[in-house]
């Protein structure tokens, strides 16, 4: 078994440590309507197409009940569309500030390319959003061989279509010769649904939800407890492997190739 390509997520995996760009915006669009949502709630659907993320938030029982208490009805599709339009407007303005490659990513990508590994990517951002992020990331030294957004396929995560399109464009098959790596539950489901080796990265992830400063300053026992919670969540949602940092990816690849493991 030889791994021929790795498909990376973007925010929380290769750029934007902690996946903070969309978080505050999701909270803001609800707050403006008198409905407070927590950071934990805002993060839960992370990785989905962003309008689906807004919709998922409105369907959470506590948020739906609070909305109903204030407005006398549940959120409508018009409400969702209006909030999404506001989300886009605010996010576009701040995205360039959240496109810096996470520490160590560029070095890992360079090492993979030296081994002849192709680099693909998928995202929950729209094509218009990624035009901003990808351009800024490229200026800072990170540019995958191919990028697929939910706009390019019939549906985003957890459907496997973005991974399939990467495979076609990169010319790699079968799918178990590829690794999908991401930082959310929806990434794990996307990879498994595509029949790929699926890896969850923990530090810098949306699931962990901590900044670099918070990680550095946190009590080691508390940090370890949080890491294990995320690790278990990834495994429960289909991850074949979990890594704490991107630097561990190549050792995972070697395990797959040397031990002839079988996807289950």
Swiss-Prot record:
UniProt xrefs under Gene3D superfamilies: HAD superfamily/HAD-like, Putative phosphatase, domain 2
A Pfam family reported for this protein in Swiss-Prot or TrEMBL: Hydrolase
EC number, as in UniProt: 3.11.1.1
Record-annotated active site: 9 (nucleophile), 50 (schiff-base intermediate with substrate)
Cofactor-binding details, from the entry: Binds 1 Mg(2+) ion per subunit.
UniProt entry keywords in alphabetical sequence: Hydrolase, Magnesium, Metal-binding, Schiff base
InterPro entries with a match to the protein in the record: HAD-like_hydrolase_sf (IPR050155), HAD-like_sf (IPR036412), HAD-SF_hydro_IA (IPR006439), HAD_sf (IPR023214), PGP-like_dom2 (IPR023198), Phosphonoacetald_hydro (IPR006323)
MF annotations from Gene Ontology: magnesium ion binding; phosphoglycolate phosphatase activity; phosphonoacetaldehyde hydrolase activity
Reactions catalysed according to its record: phosphonoacetaldehyde + H2O = acetaldehyde + phosphate + H(+)
GO terms, biological process: DNA repair; organic phosphonate catabolic process
GO cellular component: cytosol
Cofactor: Mg(2+)
Disulfide bond entries: none
Positions bound to Mg(2+): 9, 11, 183
Assembly notes: Homodimer.
The family this protein is said to belong to: Belongs to the HAD-like hydrolase superfamily. PhnX family.
Function recorded in the entry: Involved in phosphonate degradation.
Protein name per Swiss-Prot or TrEMBL: Phosphonoacetaldehyde hydrolase
Species name: Bacillus thuringiensis (strain Al Hakam)
């Amino acid at each position: 078994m030889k791994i021929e390509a790795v498909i990376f997520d973007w925010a929380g995996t290769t750029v934007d440590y902690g996946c903070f760009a969309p978080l505050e915006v999701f909270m803001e669009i609800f707050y403006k309507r008198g409905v407070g949502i927590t950071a934990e709630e805002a993060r839960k659907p992370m990785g989905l197409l962003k309008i689906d993320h807004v919709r998922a938030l409105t369907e959470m029982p506590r948020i739906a009940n609070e909305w109903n208490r204030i407005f006398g009805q549940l959120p409508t599709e018009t409400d969702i569309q209006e909030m999404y339009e506001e989300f886009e407007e605010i996010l576009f303005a701040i995205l360039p500030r959240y496109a810096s490659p996470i520490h160590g990513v560029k070095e890992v990508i360079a090492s993979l390319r030296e081994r002849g590994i192709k680099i693909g990517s998928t995202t929950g951002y729209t094509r218009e959003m990624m035009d901003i992020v990808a351009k800024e990331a490229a200026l800072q030294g990170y540019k995958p061989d191919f990028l697929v957004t939910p706009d390019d396929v019939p549906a985003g995560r957890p459907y496997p279509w973005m991974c399939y399109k990467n495979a076609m464009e990169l010319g790699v098959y079968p799918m178990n010769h590829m690794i999908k790596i991401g930082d959310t539950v929806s990434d794990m489901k996307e990879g498994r649904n595509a029949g790929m080796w699926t890896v969850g990265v923990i530090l810098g992830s949306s699931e962990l939800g901590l900044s670099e400063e918070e990680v550095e300053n946190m009590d080691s026992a508390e940090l370890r407890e949080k890491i294990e919670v995320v690790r278990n969540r990834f495994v429960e949602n289909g991850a074949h492997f979990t890594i704490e940092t991107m630097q561990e990816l190549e050792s995972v690849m070697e395990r797959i190739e040397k031990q002839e493991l079988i996807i289950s």
